[in-house]
């Protein structure tokens, strides 16, 4: 039969490319689980009262090329002016070798957070390099593996100071008035939520205040002033006040390390180490502190440990500080950080090395010096006495100067009274200097750059006082001194990549993580200069393309969530939780009900939920779950009744973290609303809702959306992420705002939770592309096939690994929990042993012991085809057979392929004294013989790692 032109155009072809199982495979799987078709399957699984009566109106699918063409037209509406705005965001030259081999490489951007260190050694080494870079630049003892952005890091620094302070009666945090305004905004938001008083004043008056537990200073102020705070920090230390300092990594190449000057905590943005501005993000923040504060440190810390063979290996250290273990008692709610961006920044330092970084820093500083000298020769007043890269220039007619600059395609900072700000960066050139002289002085300035350069070099006093110059060397470890050719760097990055297991190698079936395809067409636009090169505070008329993209994406998300408004600012899921809970608090306060601070959270909740509630100033109360894994309605009613007028909210996840669609979810919402509370529906499992139901239709008031789960942004090995929040109309006035940029379409007057007004804006094109190419029907089909895949695995494995929770008709949602406790009781083999043995079979383990200890939670996503599902099923069945051989005594419990897993190449060629063969150890299936993933290390010794904390690069002799 002849096809029509419309059929031949195949505009919905991407749907089949995104969804793994073919229609034929889907029918085979449906037959296996006892359903005639996908609609029948949904009818049996999803409660009828929450199923949408019609598809969300977001339009039809389109082809990859059509979506790219449409997005290219949107991007063309952005205007890429040269930015001299500064304020923590700078032009960069991302080395092409890093862009191609890391930023654009699925081996780097599709991996998950390195909870399984044996399959993450490459990424962990790159993060250790980032930590070493941070330690060298800051002069402190302990560094983390990135935070969300500089402003968030400042808020975390305040939290650390409060936790670690010996001044337990003190409740005031001092902020120097020349800290970046967006940083002040975010810190004040956090302080308000946790009951901390804030003073913003001239830093010289910090010592006058007596009730301080901490102080926030900025080494190079927002207007460019370079400060010597040594005497101030000495006086504060004598009083027990903790000093936190914001710093610029490029400035630190030339300036004395703040830790050596007396700072206790140092943080900043690593953006200018090779990461584009991207209209505000994503960017990695660095964070370092003194050894004494290690237990109060926020975020991930990579530590050097050893494996079962005694070889050096890397892991995430001191995880007992974190939300997935400590819950509401955690140091922070941080889950996703900015791993991919931290790795780019660290690799930038590896590529340039100490000499290359110094050359870049000196050139940037020289350009500022030349401009300053030329202006001073012409009688122009500078408001700076010492500087690194930024000058504040007094001008009689600021509007005219800004307008002239626009004529040259240049943006200057324009929010200063009677002055403009000019910040140089790696991209600044001689031509820019010429243009700036003309803008500020007119065409006939007659200044010669080379002459000015000579005068700057001959000057007796520099713009950086000698006492503030760095004297100690930086980046002395060999890793920063051997990969300066592109060939060497390319091979180093490839060697690291091979040590990791990412989606380009195998399925990553982590429950509650949604490791779906991040399609190439979705990723391509993020490096377009029209998206990558914009400053977040550029004039709004230069960002019309971004504004259009953001408004379209927000409208689509409104339709897909059933809410009335969406705020795109939060740049992680945990930050979205925090923002949503703050909206609830502010709403209650606006109604004169500020006493509503009790937050009910089911026992099965993600660890971020109680951590976020605590951060938002709420008290956490746990609600019981019944034997079927559902919220215990009797317990909920009683706790809601007891809370009464103190009830603020409930945080629920849907489908539940137990992997089922709770039949009573609407009743849960009604109970909470009855007692005056709000319903926060965690969007972690939104991949099982899209196109089928919505949080708003269910009855929730606010949700965050993990765009790095449901909407195809890659996990990046632990970030970036995006966690925008959807809200009902009554909460819309209480979502985050921004003191620098007015958020179009939102009436909020609230403080910011992120440094940039739209969070990590430059990765939002990924979700735009995903939704545009899938369309309403494709998105519904994706959710449905995700449910099909999970049920196929549950049915195939359920006979040997009991599925802990099922719905009333025996089905699961988009993930299933395999109960390993009976096996462990019979054989002694643990969930950890099974997880590590899966590495030998070429798989990343499912989520271990969450939400129930002794289990594995499996989420296959819609992108995995039947062959990959069958490969995973075969691996799990083979592992069960191996457990049986231990159980029957064929293999001793102390020496078998499970407890010894994973097996390395080094082990294969060494002495072999095990009761099982080498082939079974490393090639347990035919597929592993054809495409083998080799772990770089054996199982890690976690106890050793925490007892011997080392978060810096070890000497090369340790790896010999």
UniProtKB/Swiss-Prot annotation:
Cofactor requirements of the protein: pyridoxal 5'-phosphate
Entry GO terms, CC: cytosol; glycine cleavage complex
UniProt KW Oxidoreductase keyword: yes
InterPro entries: GcvP, GDC-P_C, GDC-P_N, GDC_P, PyrdxlP-dep_Trfase, PyrdxlP-dep_Trfase_major, PyrdxlP-dep_Trfase_small
The entry's keywords: Oxidoreductase, Pyridoxal phosphate
Oxidoreductase in keyword set: yes
GO molecular function: glycine binding; glycine dehydrogenase (decarboxylating) activity; pyridoxal phosphate binding
Assigned EC number: 1.4.4.2
Gene3D superfamilies named in the record: Aspartate Aminotransferase, domain 1, Type I PLP-dependent aspartate aminotransferase-like (Major domain)
Catalytic activity: N(6)-[(R)-lipoyl]-L-lysyl-[glycine-cleavage complex H protein] + glycine + H(+) = N(6)-[(R)-S(8)-aminomethyldihydrolipoyl]-L-lysyl-[glycine-cleavage complex H protein] + CO2
Domain of life: Bacteria
NCBIfam families associated with the record: gcvP (TIGR00461), PRK04366.1 (NF003346)
Free-text function comment from the UniProt entry: The glycine cleavage system catalyzes the degradation of glycine. The P protein binds the alpha-amino group of glycine through its pyridoxal phosphate cofactor; CO(2) is released and the remaining methylamine moiety is then transferred to the lipoamide cofactor of the H protein.
Family assignment from sequence similarity: Belongs to the GcvP family.
Protein name: Glycine dehydrogenase (decarboxylating)
Source organism of this protein record: Edwardsiella ictaluri (strain 93-146)
Gene, per the UniProt record: gcvP
